[in-house]
Amino acid sequence: SYTLTADITVTEPYANEFTGTFDGNGHTVTLALENEAGECQALFSKIAASGKVQNLGIAGTVTGKKYVGGIAGKNAGSIENCKNTAAIKGASADGRWIGGIAGETSNGSKILNCYNIGTISSDRSGKGVCLGGIAGNAPSAKISNCYNAGQIVTKSTTNYGAIAGCGYGVTVSNCYFIAVDNLKGVY
């Protein structure tokens, strides 16, 4: 178990799969992650099913190719009581699975009581962008008590949304978004 005791700046993602509990203790991590060819660009590249991140704020900028988010590139665990104000960008024509909290959250994972006010964007123009305010892709995941007030910027005409861009089998409950532009998509 880890507890953050001060605000910090991070320039590289935690690359190993995170299996413990990380309590941000109300502090903010400012990210400066700029790797246009990078996958799983976020504070935590991957959160395992046993992993939990809570009470954390994210600021700064994150740029990557696939699985790009504020807290997690890929989440299989639990993210609770977190916020993102960072600009999250999927670079290149292949920039996809981009979300404010997680690029992808899947297979029984949870995102609870979180919000995004950062701009979420992708340079991809084709199908499969999966761009969302909370999670880019959320198959078989649970997203509850969350909101998005961040702008969603994409060249794509499908697979983007205020909460989740894609998500076969996703459960979204008690979530809302503040309208910015013409959001559509899964939720």
Where do the model's predicted regions map?
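Predominantly extracellular beta-rich ligand-binding scaffolds that present long acidic/polar faces
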Residues: S1-Y187
